Amino acid sequence: MSEQTIKILVTAVLFLQGVAHGRAFFALLYQSMGRLPASWLPVRSWLLPSLSAKTVAGVASIFWLLSTLGFLAMGLSYWGLLLPPDLWSQLAVPSAIISTLGIILISGIWPGAPNRQLAILDTVIALIVNIAILVAQLWLHWPPQ
């Protein structure tokens, strides 16, 4: 695979991860304001089950906002657009960890998903991307500097 093809694929994955987290962030924002559409699954915390869904959504929205900004900045940086090209690798590990913590803290329910199957699918895809980022950065040290 050519270097340009890899660059396009990695940038696309980072942007899609950012957009997916952004969509989830807005779903959490709606839920924290008490505007949860009937078709969306409410988020809950296994760690603090006594918290209301609105409170959990408010707390979780912080994780998703930070993840959204991190993944979108990573995509811009990796592509070399508006941000220094080496910035993406500095954002990679923190963004993936914040995203993973957010997913774990709210029981793996992807915010804004219309049903449990899509919530699980969205969650699994996000976790796979997060794990791939962590493995690439921490274990493989990719891309080489």
Predicted regions mapped to residue ranges:
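Membrane-interface extramembranous regions
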Residues: 2-145
